[in-house]
């Protein structure tokens, strides 16, 4: 039996981050986490591009454009959607999730879901580097691993 898996060596790979500006004070912490993960695993700063979009809903389109460019081993999507008093949260979360998954499937480039979806601001803060780790860091790690796995198949 042959086991296929990726490693966490990011050297000589280029990655893109797409970040939603809405709730920027949280998203900036997610970006910091992603950059930390990339740096710790050998990705040079010059091999990371960051694209800002207005909010989470706009992330899939830019992620698709970046993935289709052929320049990147992976694309990390970072944003924050916090539940409010209306059903808007449910629509945004559902469509962004589907959009990001479809981009990855359509382009065969790892497009990683690093969107923090929470019930309240406290939960979002926890997932941006306090109690619950940093989901940006986790997303960058997944991008590195998936990029290497795809190379091994």
From Swiss-Prot:
Which SUPFAM superfamilies does the record cross-reference, listed alphabetically? Lumazine synthase
List the catalysed reactions.
(2S)-2-hydroxy-3-oxobutyl phosphate + 5-amino-6-(D-ribitylamino)uracil = 6,7-dimethyl-8-(1-D-ribityl)lumazine + phosphate + 2 H2O + H(+)
Keyword annotations for this protein?
A: Riboflavin biosynthesis, Transferase
Q: What is its EC number?
A: 2.5.1.78
Q: Which residues bind (2S)-2-hydroxy-3-oxobutyl phosphate?
A: 85-86, 127
Residues of the active site: 88
Q: Where does 5-amino-6-(D-ribitylamino)uracil bind?
A: 22, 56-58, 80-82, 113
GO cellular component term, pick one: cytosol
| GO BP annotation list | riboflavin biosynthetic process
Tell me the Pfam families matching this sequence. DMRL_synthase (PF00885)
User: What GO annotations for molecular function exist for this entry?
Assistant: 6,7-dimethyl-8-ribityllumazine synthase activity
Q: What does this protein do?
A: Catalyzes the formation of 6,7-dimethyl-8-ribityllumazine by condensation of 5-amino-6-(D-ribitylamino)uracil with 3,4-dihydroxy-2-butanone 4-phosphate. This is the penultimate step in the biosynthesis of riboflavin.
Q: Which family does it belong to?
A: Belongs to the DMRL synthase family.
Name of the protein described by the UniProt record: 6,7-dimethyl-8-ribityllumazine synthase
What organism does the UniProt record list as the source? Clostridium perfringens (strain ATCC 13124 / DSM 756 / JCM 1290 / NCIMB 6125 / NCTC 8237 / Type A)
The coding gene here is: ribH
